[in-house]
């Protein structure tokens, strides 16, 4: 299974060049069964079910992934569902947890809370015990953010998010992928 995300669409339109050496076949996210592993690979074995972030080639029948760019497919998820995870999960993990080192009981402000990255950030931060505020551009998107776990959704068209966040105690980490 393959995910389809904005960079795939931009590559197809010629607006986002693939990395040097990447396959010409589109597809930055894929999920499937490991059919072969390279020498020195210890994390994965033939038959493992994985989802991976790729430089390209995810739309092909077979794709090549670095072992560090693959994740086990969580129990209960289909291949199709899992194929939609790598780009957002790895982006949020790298930015929020590795770079910014968000910790339990800290507060994360997510701009664009109803986006793919935003919805993933809300859920991951909550799962790790953080308090979450999320901005969005209309009432429906604010409700979605709160349904996904944001403690407070902020409609930036009708509220001054800086004032709201300050009044609620501030934020330790800000994720702005907009």
What kind of feature is each model-predicted range?
Residues 1-3, 13-57:
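Glycine-rich beta-strand-centered segment in the early N-terminal region that forms part
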Residues 6:
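Helix-loop element at the rim of GNAT/NAT acetyltransferase active sites that forms part
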Residues 23, 43, 49-114, 147:
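NAD(P)H dinucleotide-binding glycine-rich loop of Rossmann-like/cofactor-binding domains
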Residues 34, 63, 92, 125, ...:
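Terminal peptide-recognition signature
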Residues 39, 75, 137:
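Short, conserved catalytic or interaction motifs in soluble domains
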Residues 83-159, 164:
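Mid-domain Rossmann-like dinucleotide-binding core that forms the NAD(H)/NADP(H) cofactor-binding site
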Residues 167-173:
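A glycine-rich helix->loop->beta "capping" turn
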């Amino acid at each position: 299974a393959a995910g389809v995300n904005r960079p795939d669409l931009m590559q197809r339109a010629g607006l986002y060049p693939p990395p040097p050496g990447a396959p010409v076949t589109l597809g930055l996210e894929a999920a499937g069964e490991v059919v072969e592993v390279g020498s020195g690979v210890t994390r994965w074995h033939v038959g493992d079910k994985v989802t991976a972030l790729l430089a390209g080639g995810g739309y092909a029948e077979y794709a090549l992934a670095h072992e560090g760019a693959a994740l086990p497919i969580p129990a209960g998820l289909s291949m199709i569902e899992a194929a939609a995870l790598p780009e957002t999960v790895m982006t949020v993990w790298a930015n929020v947890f590795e770079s910014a080192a968000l910790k339990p009981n800290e507060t994360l402000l997510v701009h664009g809370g109803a986006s793919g990255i935003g919805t993933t950030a809300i859920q991951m931060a909550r799962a790790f015990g953080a308090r979450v505020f999320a901005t969005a551009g209309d009432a429906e998107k604010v409700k979605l953010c709160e349904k996904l776990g944001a403690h407070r959704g902020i409609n930036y068209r009708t509220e001054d998010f800086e004032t709201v966040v300050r009044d609620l105690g501030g934020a330790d980490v800000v994720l702005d992928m907009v």
